[in-house]
Design a protein with these regions (language model features):
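Acidic Ca2+-chelating loop motifs
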Residues: 1-15
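Short beta->alpha transition motifs characteristic of CBS
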Residues: 13-16, 86-88
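Active-site-adjacent helix/loop patches that line small-molecule binding or acyl-intermediate pockets
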Residues: 23-52, 109-205
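A short, well-structured edge-of-sheet supersecondary motif
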Residues: 48-85
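Short, conserved micro-motifs enriched in small and acidic residues
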Residues: 70, 92-101, 144-145
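Active-site SXXK
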Residues: 80, 94-114
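Glycine/charged-rich beta-loop-alpha catalytic/anionic-binding loops adjacent to active sites
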Residues: 81-90, 131-137
């Protein structure tokens, strides 16, 4: 179907859940939730044309080098079953901000109190704003753990990177998870804003 006219009846279960404000138990399998390869393929085919409307992230030079024609949808359940469709299924990608909830979980497991990391509240500020402390609201911590300031605050719990990497491999079930050196070096060369955020957090204790 043409972009914009896809009825997405395959998402009926999800819509019903949202309408009824119910939650799908995490123990359910993909099959139990009615998620099939055919459904995911139809969603992918509908969404793919929109991918050309976006832009590569040029603020990190290495990310501007990825192939914009590659895309994929990958869904897994806690039973280890996985559905993967698209021409980018085998492409190794940088997880970028997807690491933020993992960082928060790691910090909590290491004994940091939520109140020591950040507030947990909505914010209208950009994800990488350097206005991390919101003094006009008399707030001395990041607004929530899923913006850059909150994630940097969570990363204060890391005193051994190998330990954090082992944690990530365990939590994701991916023993091959590794640092992408080219992306790391590219980020290190352009991360002045994040360094500024870190210094402001250090200055406030």
């Amino acid at each position: 179907k043409e972009p914009g006219v896809f009825q997405a009846k395959e998402l009926q279960l999800l819509q019903t859940i949202l309408d009824n404000q119910k939650r799908v138990p995490l123990t359910l399998s993909l099959g139990d939730m009615g998620i099939t390869t055919d459904i995911v393929s139809k969603i992918y085919d509908w969404a793919k044309p929109y991918a050309t409307e976006g832009e590569l992230a040029s603020y990190i030079p290495e990310l501007a080098n990825v192939d914009p024609d590659k895309s994929a949808i990958v869904i897994g359940d806690l039973q280890g079953d996985m559905i993967a469709v698209g021409n980018g299924v085998d492409v190794k990608v940088s997880i970028q901000s997807v690491v933020k909830p993992f960082l928060y979980i790691y910090a909590l497991q290491k004994g940091l109190a939520p109140s020591d990391i950040s507030y947990i509240e909505p914010t209208a500020m950009h994800f990488n704003t350097d206005a991390v402390l919101q003094p006009e609201s008399h707030k001395s911590r990041p607004g929530h753990p899923l913006n850059n300031a909150g994630a940097i605050s969570s990363s204060g719990a890391i005193d051994n990177f190998d330990d954090f990497l082992a944690f990530m491999r365990c939590l994701t079930g991916n023993p091959k998870l590794a640092v992408m050196e080219d992306v790391y070096l590219s980020e290190m060369a352009t991360n002045a804003n994040n360094r500024a955020i870190a210094m402001r957090l250090v200055a406030t204790g």
